[in-house]
Structures are given as structure tokens and as C-alpha cells.
Amino acid sequence: MAIEGLIKQGFVTMSLDRVINWARTGSLWPMTFGLACCAVEMMEAGSSRYDLDRFGIVFRPTPRQSDLMIVAGTLTNKMAPALRKVYDQMPEPKWVISMGSCANGGGYYHYSYAVIRGCDRIVPVDIYVPGCPPTAEALLYGIMQLQDKIRRTNTIART
């Protein structure tokens, strides 16, 4: 976080947008939506080797407590309404990471009658993590890209 100005006696001045975005990037609470083998790599990212807790990322069991949804795996026609319902239950601001080839565009099962060809047809996606399955490092990089995106957004509406 860059300092815009320093005043005497240790006071720092900066825009409220930057303070809010700094707080949001340091406390992402993802709600996991594991549908296939990509979910195993998502669980690996939460283990002690990669330790998402050091980034302030704490997995939440309910959508009402989370601001990030990680969709990992093949999204079928039967699961699409459940995905949308969970997304609608999340409070604003909310972000979505699409993890893996199946979540991004259908993957190996792209031409199947039962598969949605990308979860972005159901919910708006902010970050796409490629791979089949993507590694835990790729998910970590995607989360860092999301943090950069959050830092660049304006949170306070200007008229």
C-alpha cells in the first residue's frame, strides 16, 4: 500500500478507497464449490504447505459469511441452479474464481449434453485459473491476481 502523503506527528493521508480495498484484499473469505478433481487441489492450497491463512484467506462453510466463491470442477446442468442460488446468497461485494478447464469452458466433457460450457454462463467470473487440474500454486496466483484487481477498483461511488 503506497503512502500518498505524510504529515507531522505520524499521520498518514490517503483516500478512503485505498483503505477499504487494502482491508478487503487482506481478508478474503472463500466459499468452496468443489465439483470434481480440481477441488482436491483447492484443498491442497489450504494445507500447511501453501498456507492460505497467511494471506488472510479463511475458508467459510456458508455463503452468507463469504465474499469469494471458488468454482472448481465440472459444472453440470443439474448443479447450475444450485451454483446460482449459492452465489445469490453471498453478500456484496463478491468475487468468483473459476478453477480448472472444466469450470472455465467445459474441459474434457465440453461436448457432453449434461455439462455447462463454463461457469461464466451462470455467474459472473472475475479470475480464470487454467489447468487440468490446476496446481495449488496456480490457484494461489489466481488469488493474488484477484487481490490486485480488488486494489484497482473504486469502492465509493462518485457522482
From Swiss-Prot:
Topology of this chain in the membrane: Peripheral membrane protein
Binding-site residues for [4Fe-4S] cluster, renumbered to this chain: C37, C38, C102, C132
Superkingdom of the organism of origin: Bacteria
Keyword Metal-binding among UniProt keywords: yes
Compartment(s) of residence: Cell inner membrane
Cofactor note: Binds 1 [4Fe-4S] cluster.
GO terms of biological process kind: aerobic respiration; electron transport coupled proton transport
Cofactor entry: [4Fe-4S] cluster
Any single Gene Ontology cellular-component annotation: respiratory chain complex I
Reaction equations catalysed: a quinone + NADH + 5 H(+)(in) = a quinol + NAD(+) + 4 H(+)(out)
InterPro entries assigned to the protein according to its UniProt record, in alphabetical order: NADH_UbQ_OxRdtase-like_20kDa, NADH_UQ_OxRdtase_20Kd_su
Similarity comment: family membership: Belongs to the complex I 20 kDa subunit family.
Subunit text: NDH-1 is composed of 14 different subunits. Subunits NuoB, C, D, E, F, and G constitute the peripheral sector of the complex.
Role summary: NDH-1 shuttles electrons from NADH, via FMN and iron-sulfur (Fe-S) centers, to quinones in the respiratory chain. Couples the redox reaction to proton translocation (for every two electrons transferred, four hydrogen ions are translocated across the cytoplasmic membrane), and thus conserves the redox energy in a proton gradient.
Protein name in the entry: NADH-quinone oxidoreductase subunit B
The encoding gene: nuoB
